[in-house]
Amino acid sequence: MKQTLNYVTYQTFPASTANSLQSISNIKYFIKKGLNVCLYFPLREKTSSDDLKVLQEYYSFTESLEIKGINHYLPHGRIQIFKKTMFHISHFLWSRRTISKYFKKNNEEIFFTRSDWIAFFAARKKYKVIFECHQESRIRNFVIKKIGDYENVYIIFLNKDLQENYKNISNSIVLHNGVDVDLFEENLQQKRNSIVYAGNLSRFGVSRGFPEFLKKYNEEKIFQEFNLEIIGGDLDQIEDLKTVVKDLNIEDYVIFHGRKNRSETINIIQMCKIGLLLNNANNTHSYQHTSPLKYFEYIYAKLSVIAIDFPSHRSLPLNQKISYFDLDKNRSLNVAINQSKNHDELSAAELRDISLETRIKKILDFAF
């Protein structure tokens, strides 16, 4: 009889966020490894849906799973003041109610979550909990302090620096994100001279730094050799950047693809030569701990990678394949691009190691 994995999260689906994509990608490969997966999440947005076909189309997967969208009659999304406080209160109440209502005492239950309060309440009921930790926060520090030494709790940290911030943990492992290799095609036509960025243009409401990057792209005349292709972003963000592009007179060299589905995104990435990692230093997670899905997609697609010089990017696996730049330094972007041309492609073993199939196998070996 197949084991059932309860993937319980305060995220909602479908959503354009990288974290929702990461969750669905993990679920897909848990299923491919032979587990039954039941996804529980709140129907907290007007666009939220627990229709399997809707999620399959949005995220480009065919695997079947059980989905339980749970009604969300809580302040977050309904009260438009003190939004951060409303989020934390709602997250706490929803998690406590979900664990209490949908799971009766059964030691066979296994949970996978990136939700602090789901991990907390499930662990306190002695269920096996696999808790994926992506960043620090005061609530997370409290939760891990309370349950980190439980023998039934297994914690996955996205990088070593994050793991080292937490002591006295019984079971933990460092696992970066991985790539869904099913989305890639072989033997595509020759790559075009383009730098590509795939993802949201802001994080937590703060720009990732594209206006500054575009100015550097223009100042160092990168457009003479490489176009810039941007996949993703809300319409208002794209319009703002188009204004910057127009003011810099580089409209002929910057292509805005807008939002694309997973297959279309990967196809565009595969057609380019260089992948871009860009973020804002004001966010601790972006600066110290991020493990972006796009990075693994870039290198699996055999792109060179250039990245703003943050500790999080230097902590990525195979970081010797990355060329770093500093937007405050003269010709830094040009130097990084030239260095990136000399990087060797990944070996077959390296490609296997960054796959989601390998990542999920490591999770199963660690916690099952």
Regions found by a protein language model. Name each.
Residues K273, Y300-K302:
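A short alpha->beta transition loop at the rim of the catalytic pocket in nucleotide-sugar-dependent
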Residues N6-V8, I156, I169, V179, ...:
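Conserved donor-binding/catalytic core segment of Leloir-type glycosyltransferases
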Residues G232, E239-I269:
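Nucleotide-activated donor-binding/catalytic signature segment of Leloir-type glycosyltransferases, i.e.
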